[in-house]
Amino acid sequence: MASNLPVRSFSEVCCAEARAAIIQMENNPDETVCNRIWKIHRDLQSSDLTTTVQVMMVYRFISKRVPEGCFAILSGVNTGMYNPRELKRSYVQSLSSGTSCEFLRSLDKLAKNLLAVHVCSDVKMSLNKRQVIDFISGEEDPTLHTAEHLTSLALDDSPSAVVYSGWQQEAIKLHNTIRKIATMRPADCKAGKFYSDILSACDQTKELLDAFDQGKLAYDRDVVLIGWMDEIIKIFSKPDYLEAKGVSYQVLKNVSNKVALLRESIWWVTELDGREYLFFDESWYLHGMSAFSDGVPGYEDFIY
C-alpha cells in the first residue's frame, strides 16, 4: 500500500467514551500501563459494554495478550440468544472470504460485542489493525467500512500517526499560546529577559518535540512537556516578570497559572516492582479550571 496514505489511529474511530483510554494506550504501549488501563475499564461499573469491549480490543492488539478476566465484562448480560461458537466460526469464514466487514455490519451491537470477547480470548487467534478497526469503528463512522475508504486508511500494522493524550494536548495548546504571546512584547518593555527566557524555553521544547515526532530522537514526549512546564513555572517565580505590563502580560500570567495547575495534576506513580508510570488526575485539573470563569483572555485567539 502506498506509503503516503494516511494511517488512522484507533482513537480516531472508536466511541467517544473509550477515546481517552485508547489514546493513552496508543501513546504509551508499555505493558504495565496498558494492563492497568484495561483492568480499570474492566472493573468500572459505570462503563458500558461497548466502551469496555473497544478498550479490550485495542489492549489485545497492542499487548498481543489475552485480556485478563475478559469474560467478566459479560457478567449480567443476557447473551443466551446467541451461539458464540457459531458467531466465531462465521467470522473466521468471513475473514477467509474477505467479507468480514459486511459480516460485522450484519450483527447487532450485543452480538458484535460477544464475538469480540471470544475473539480476544482465543490465544490461537491473532488480530491485525484492520480487524480491530472493523470492530470498533461501526458506531462512530459507518463510511469507514466502505471499500474505497478502507483503501485510503492504509490499515496496516505500522505505528500510528502522532496522537497526543488529553493532558499532552492541553500542554501543547498552552505552549503555543505562551510562545505566541511572548513574541508580542511591548517595544518599551523593561522585562526583556522575562520574555526572552519564555521564548527560549518554548523554542527548545518545540525543537525537541519536532525531532521526536520525526523519529530523529528517542526523547519521551511526556518528559519533554513536563520539563517545559517546570521551566515556565520557574521563570514566573523570578522577579524579572514584575517589570512586565499590559494585556500580553495578563494573558501570560493567566496561562502560566494553567500550566502550574496542569503540572500539579500529573505525577509519577511507582508500582511495587519499582516500575513508574505517569498518572493524570483530570478531575483535579478540571476542578481547578472552574476557577477561570471564562477562560484565559484571548486564549483561543493565540492557538495555532
UniProtKB/Swiss-Prot annotation:
S-S bonds: none
GO biological process: symbiont-mediated suppression of host cytoplasmic pattern recognition receptor signaling pathway via inhibition of IRF3 activity; symbiont-mediated suppression of host cytoplasmic pattern recognition receptor signaling pathway via inhibition of IRF7 activity
Keywords: Host-virus interaction, Inhibition of host innate immune response by virus, Inhibition of host IRF3 by virus, Inhibition of host IRF7 by virus, Inhibition of host RLR pathway by virus, Viral immunoevasion
UniProt xrefs under Pfam families: Mx_ML
Main function: Blocks host IRF3 and IRF7, thereby inhibiting IFN-beta expression and activation of host antiviral state.
Name by which UniProt lists this protein: Protein ML
